Amino acid sequence: MIKLTPRQAEILGFIKRCLEDNGFPPTRAEIAQELGFKSPNAAEEHLKALARKGAIEMTPGASRGIRIPGFEARPDESSLPVIGRVAAGAPILAQQHIEESCNINPSFFHPSANYLLRVHGMSMKDVGILDGDLLAVHTTREARNGQIVVARIGDEVTVKRFKREGSKVWLLAENPDFAPIEVDLKDQELVIEGLSVGVIRR
């Protein structure tokens, strides 16, 4: 059994509440505000102590890079996690990628969305997907020609229109300034992470 100080137990409880209510952990600043610390640095020291005791795991360099081993978050069914930049090799829905939660019902989209992916760049501007938009994504490994997909090639995640002929796949931009990405599945792995089912502009 992990032995925690009262303060550490209080912080761990707050992290659990955030995971249950929002689906993602708090930032250091949010912990400092909730617990009355003068600065996020004080929260960081307590988090390091919790990590040393094995109560949490921390991802360096990520503002929300906190997870509790064995703890399954139950996010609000009327909200979706917003995914920012995806780290190389990490699952898209890894906690360190979640920036915030957006209050929109997943069933608003068809098929229902599993998460919102923040768009970076203008490669899909001609179909109205712009830099900074939130792309609603339905998680699936299957895609048909012509669908807009979230695809992973090596360590890169990209949003493009899907086209396949035999073992050849083309990921097509909707902007003439961007060349198609061609992948031969015999030589290179390509993973479909999901389908675009909508766009939110803030």
Swiss-Prot record:
Its EC number is 3.4.21.88. It catalyses: Hydrolysis of Ala-|-Gly bond in repressor LexA. Residues 28-48 bind DNA. One of its GO terms (molecular function) is DNA binding. SUPFAM superfamilies: LexA/Signal peptidase, Winged helix' DNA-binding domain. GO terms for biological process: DNA repair; DNA replication; negative regulation of DNA-templated transcription; proteolysis; SOS response. The active site is at 123 (for autocatalytic cleavage activity), 160 (for autocatalytic cleavage activity). Keywords: Autocatalytic cleavage, DNA damage, DNA repair, DNA replication, DNA-binding, Hydrolase, Repressor, SOS response, Transcription, Transcription regulation. Disulfide bonds: none annotated. InterPro entries: LexA, LexA-like, LexA/Signal_pep-like_sf, LexA_DNA-bd_dom, LexA_repressor, Peptidase_S24_LexA, Peptidase_S24_S26A/B/C, WH-like_DNA-bd_sf. The keyword Hydrolase applies. The record marks 88-89 as: Cleavage. Homodimer. Represses a number of genes involved in the response to DNA damage (SOS response), including recA and lexA. In the presence of single-stranded DNA, RecA interacts with LexA causing an autocatalytic cleavage which disrupts the DNA-binding part of LexA, leading to derepression of the SOS regulon and eventually DNA repair. This is LexA repressor 1.
